[in-house]
Amino acid sequence: YAVSPWTRNGGVFTEHAAHESQIMFLEEWSKAVGKGFHTKEINPWRRAQFSNLVNMLDFSYHDGSVLKLDEVPEASKDPITDQYNGADVCALKFRSDVQPTVPYNNTEAQSLRVEKGYKPVRGNLTEGHYLTFEKDGKALQHKGHKLSLTNACNDHDGKDMRFVLWWQGKNPKDNAFYISTADKHDRKYIASSLELTTKEKAAQFSIADLGNGKGHVITEIDSGKQLSVEKDGCVALTKNASDAFKVFSVTF
């Protein structure tokens, strides 16, 4: 979790990170305030491959309002020693049920249950999400035989708007993906022509976060062209496109 005025309502951040990422974030912060330092203990490969977490922050939006937190009871203390005794109180309260029971007879549907909803995405992307890509009230859709646009919906979860990424890199920061439809029973992949095709004919795309709320740019790697929304409402690959898409991670 990241708590700051620049991460409020920030949603999902999926860049590859490790403990070193926190140190690299402090390095970036120290440079920004004019007191930079460099930690030599982080080896070059990890420094190159893991996130410095800066993309978590949106410096174009600031919310400094004070959160209203729920009231919680004061932690229990022993009346004689004045030491915290929460573990003993818990053991006494639940007696033989201190350890959770083994969840026998649970089904896969129960164990993998998640809440329905959506969150905006920050940072460069990874696998493991259903994603929608939107711009100016329109959303990319895979209805028919070619990538096209439709009106976005409030919950960002239209069946024809959901896409899945398939990572094609070797190192964590390799930004190369197949983009497919979400239906595992009739999965189609986006080709360089933006038509929907088989995996064997799929194109590889990079998806880069421009930072500070500007959105993500989608680039077809072989041609170097970027996914763009044309004036006539069609989707095309063009050079130096200015279009960036807002990305939402969706569960349904």
Predicted regions mapped to residue ranges:
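Extracellular glycan-recognition/adhesion modules and their associated mucin-like linkers
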Residues: 103-145, 164-194, 207-233, 249-252
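Substrate-binding rim/cap in mid-to-C-terminal beta-strand-loop elements of soluble/periplasmic
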Residues: 1-29
